[in-house]
Design a protein with these regions (language model features):
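Conserved beta3 VAIK motif of the Hanks protein kinase fold
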Residues: 90
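Structured beta-strand/turn binding interfaces of compact recognition modules in eukaryotic regulators
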Residues: 93
Length: 249
């Protein structure tokens, strides 16, 4: 879905009539947005309006909704905003989920968005609609920090850019080889896509004595295995890798 640039005021006003809102979503290419996401965005708007009743601040404009990155890996971004010096990403959750799940998503988003430009600071947030708790991702400590909407509002630049910079990453590969790029692997300059995360989860949670991992060439099998090994090693487990090679005589 390629969203148009959304102004939160017009987004709210268009909801007064079902037909108008249906047309608004169509012309802005946000037909896939669901009711829980709409509710969360409405709450964010109301919080911003409390801080700026005139709604004239630039923080009300410049949003891309439901943007999908479909390069080598696949990710979806609920709210994105680009300005000359900053990228804002706000993820929307209807109910509270584990902090670990939130962190995994924001780490992936941080890596992708940080690849756009070294001149643009990246700020990542998650808003839980049910509890109205807002978290900011601390990239230094890789932790979630509960913050106020005033802090978020102040973090958003007045200016914005009407271009989705994710489109510039289409031909960029974010799957690395732990064999040939060990420095990137050990400095965590990679992430697993959704399918790889699911495969990793099955491996870690399996109660079987032997588990096999199958996949076509280039799907990241080695990366998954090395990632599992690194995680287990960091938790105090001892890991042994045995590499089987076929010798021709």
């Amino acid at each position: 879905m390629k969203s148009g640039v959304i102004n939160l005021v017009s987004f709210m006003e268009s909801q007064t009539d079902d037909d108008i809102f249906r047309y608004y979503k169509k012309i802005n290419h946000i037909e896939e947005i669901n009711d829980t996401e709409i509710e969360a965005i409405n709450k964010i708007f109301e919080k911003f309006k409390e801080l700026e009743p005139s709604c004239m601040n630039g923080a009300f404009s410049g949003y891309f909704l439901g943007t999908k990155y479909t390069g080598v890996v696949s990710e979806e971004f609920d709210m994105l905003r680009f300005s000359n010096q900053k990228i804002i990403n706000i993820e929307l959750k209807s109910t509270q989920i584990s902090e670990d799940r939130i962190l995994r998503q924001l780490k992936r988003h941080s890596y992708l968005l940080s690849s756009i430009s070294s001149d643009m600071e990246v700020s990542l947030y998650t808003f839980v609609s049910e509890t109205e708790i807002l978290y900011k991702f601390d990239e230094v400590t890789e932790t979630l920090i509960p913050i106020s909407f005033e802090q978020l509002f102040e973090d958003i630049s007045f200016d914005f850019i009407e271009y989705n910079y994710l489109e510039s990453l289409v031909n960029t590969s974010f799957i690395i080889s732990p064999y040939s790029e060990p420095d990137r692997f050990f400095s965590n300059q990679y992430f697993l896509n959704n399918e790889q995360e699911q495969a990793k989860k099955k491996l870690v949670e399996s109660s079987k004595k032997y588990v096999g991992l199958k996949g076509a060439a280039g799907t990241g099998k080695s990366l998954i295995l090395f990632d599992v090994a690194k995680e287990l090693s960091n938790s105090g487990e001892k890991i042994l890798f045995v590499f089987a090679l076929q010798f021709m005589i």
